[in-house]
Amino acid sequence: MKQMSSAQVRQMWLDFWATKGHAVEPSVSLVPVNDPTLLWINSGVATLKKYFDGTIIPENPRITNAQKAIRTNDIENVGKTARHHTMFEMLGNFSIGDYFRDEAIEWAYELLTSPEWFDFPKDKLYMTYYPDDKDSYNRWIAMGVEPSHLIPIEDNFWEIGAGPSGPDTEIFFDRGEAFDPENIGVRLLEEDIENDRYIEIWNIVLSQFNADPAVPRSEYKELPHKNIDTGAGLERLVAVIQGAKTNFETDLFMPIIREVEKLSGKVYDQDGDNMSFKVIADHIRSLSFAIGDGALPGNEGRGYVLRRLLRRASMHGQKLGINEPFLYKLVPTVGKIMESYYPEVLEKQEFIEKIIKSEEESFARTLHSGQHFAETIVADLKAKGQTVISGQDAFKLYDTYGFPLELTEEIAEEADMTVDRAGFEAAMKEQQDRARASVVKGGSMGMQNETLQAITVESAFNYEKEELTAELLAIVADDAAVESVETGTAALIFAETPFYAEMGGQVADHGQIFDGAGNLVAQVTDVQKAPNGQPLHTVEVLAPLALGQSYKLEIDHSRRHRVMKNHTATHLLHAALHNVLGNHATQAGSLNEVEFLRFDFTHFQAVTAEELRAIEQEVNEKIWEALAIETVETDIDTAKEMGAMALFGEKYGKEVRVVTIGDYSVELCGGTHVGNTSEIGIFKIVKEEGIGSGTRRILAVTSKEAFEAYREEEEALKAIAATLKAPQIKEVPHKVEALQEQLRQLQKENAELKEKAAAAASGEVFKDVQEANGHSFIASQVSVSDAGALRTFADTWKQKDYSDVLVLVAAIGDKVNVLAASKTKDVHAGNLIKELAPIVDGRGGGKPDMAMAGGSKQSAIPDLLAAVAEKL
């Protein structure tokens, strides 16, 4: 077996499949593009779904890739096992309706065992297969594999919901008896026993059925085009090739671990407790790549996952004695390890470091808040005479504040308490189940559409014309290919078309179709790309249409031009975002509609009013400069040399279209654009908002819609000016400021009057002092207009020695407001209010010296006042 670096293993994989006629697909962003079903790209095949379900037919049906992926449904196992990771690389080879079982097995065996390639010892390889899949068994036998090395496993059938499915055959590497202390042997495979001896290195899925959850597996229909989908984990392959005990002792992780050793002063013990080193090494890879791809830490979705990973790694850093932000210092090491295939980490190093360091500092503050929350829990339990921190509270400390269970148990032990570990684990399992359920939701591929896949006629989109005459080549009606259609809805393909198919965020053209006599025969309501790439026109048929006939196709010119203005403005906006916010503000999605444009981009905070003003100003200046728009078709390498901005994660063919706006913007784009920026007229941002962790959205309008938006604002300002009796709009701010000052003065006078009234009333309230359990207290109902007046009463009470405890109740509207205050350490106002509030169907809490509660049962106010003595 050859000794190789991880970079050499990856490259050998790609080189081998290239010799078998496979196109090498580049790794795409971890953040899925145009796939809302996935939180992350979680496999090599996730980026190829449209090929497998037949939505798109690839140029080359043979594909190979090395794809970075993230799976986080088993975060807690990372660091505990030899092979669990959050981020990993999946090596794959795929056949879309081309070769099948025989070639897949033959070539896999060749790559693994040939001296020219990996040169694995043949006697170290074991294969599992689906019991009913005799063809795979026979093919392995034909390759020379011993029958004793072929294990039938009932679970070797791949399916996730509806769509492509089929048996799979897995390849394992036997690391020997040293990893099998009980000498169980091949039974470890037969009985699916977790072990470190037989390492799964490759799974070959033979996708030959359209799975249908409504019928038994035996009734699944054969796919019209059978596929091969395989996955081999790079980390596992490298561990086997480098003879590492675990994946972490390979060149993919050890440089990171060495850096952690330097930062901590601790030494990684291969055979000892090294979990913290492993967690940090794994999680910093995920953080570096995910943030580099535009995901940012937050409270939901991808952001929540990243925040969890960072906090877990940070806590493990503390276990190693690192008590300051340190994870950001590991980013350069991650970048250097991966730069041969993934240069983006080093390219975005400064930004990634900034985000991670900021999040580490924020977590330090959160930990402090968590410490306060933990102290409150302990104090409340002591006050109630209880000694067990609930599983829910322990989980909240873990989930919200990042406290590992062990830290909560230490806090409990110091207070002579324990933690409900079973309750914590139950809450944890609920969360894990939710995570796993979300993973399954996104796994299914759609059913293959045989009719559309079978249409292979050539059709071209003409950028230069808005109307032309072309032959009708295909008609699909009621999911069948037909020669003619007379009424209803149909899908049409022409030899050539001026209609733009929806793509790249630009909506489709609408328009009309005429026959040779000039009669209107169909209305075009949508245009999409067919599986083989042809523009597919959805039409409402108004008169008979037949194959082989020529028709005049004419787009809605006004609609097209309005969309073009918005699309060109989107390019200007993208460039302005880079200039104002930074290069990290890259496109995360866009929509170029008729009446507006919507642009999603990565950014770690809300865009300020000043920044929005600068962005809007810059876009308009480029419009007024009347910059010419030029388009050129070239190869991808030339486009990159031109400085074209490609959307990370998008797939581009050999030939690409470059759209240049003066010397201001250069982007790869297949959409339609105006000839000069002056045609846009004017650009206006109407809204900026967050749509998810680390992702912002700008809604903007151009031309007529922008003018109308400005007019609406002007009319609103005129109305305000009239109300304020301002002669001119520009005087409105001054008038508003004057009103605000008047309001502040009135509020001040009102507050002073309330204080005087409270002081006068308090003289009566504070006279009624009672005794209970050695404490003096006042419990009274007062008449006030708001809860703030209760605090005024309390402030007056604090200034003199009226009593040890004060409880005030007020009926305000249909609600009940309660205040408790204490001057003695023996009575905790927050705990007292928690016991009193339920009497009026309320709840509340607060500090030891003052607390508030709200309730709704006014009839129970006398009961609450009567209960004060008992609670004391």
UniProtKB/Swiss-Prot annotation:
The transmembrane residues are none
Q: How is the cofactor bound?
A: Binds 1 zinc ion per subunit.
Q: Which GO terms describe its cellular component?
A: cytosol
Q: Which UniProt keywords apply?
A: Aminoacyl-tRNA synthetase, ATP-binding, Cytoplasm, Ligase, Metal-binding, Nucleotide-binding, Protein biosynthesis, RNA-binding, tRNA-binding, Zinc
Give EC number(s), comma-separated.
6.1.1.7
| Pfam (any one) | tRNA_SAD
Q: Which domain of life is it from?
A: Bacteria
Where the protein is mainly located, per its record?
Answer: cytoplasm
Q: Which GO terms describe its biological process?
A: alanyl-tRNA aminoacylation
Which amino acid positions bind Zn(2+), per UniProt?
H567, H571, C669, H673
Q: Name the cystine pairs.
A: none
What range does the record give for the signal peptide? none
The UniProt entry, under InterPro entries, shows:
aa-tRNA-synth_II/BPL/LPL, Ala-tRNA-lgiase_IIc, Ala-tRNA-ligase_IIc_anticod-bd, Ala-tRNA-synth_IIc_core, Ala-tRNA-synth_IIc_N, Ala-tRNA_ligase, Ala_tRNA_ligase_euk/bac, DHHA1_dom
Has UniProt tagged this entry with the keyword Glycoprotein? no
| Record GO terms (molecular function) | alanine-tRNA ligase activity; aminoacyl-tRNA deacylase activity; ATP binding; catalytic activity, acting on a protein; transferase activity; tRNA binding; zinc ion binding
Q: Which family does it belong to?
A: Belongs to the class-II aminoacyl-tRNA synthetase family.
- Report the domain remarks: Consists of three domains; the N-terminal catalytic domain, the editing domain and the C-terminal C-Ala domain. The editing domain removes incorrectly charged amino acids, while the C-Ala domain, along with tRNA(Ala), serves as a bridge to cooperatively bring together the editing and aminoacylation centers thus stimulating deacylation of misacylated tRNAs.
In its UniProt entry, what is this protein called? Alanine--tRNA ligase
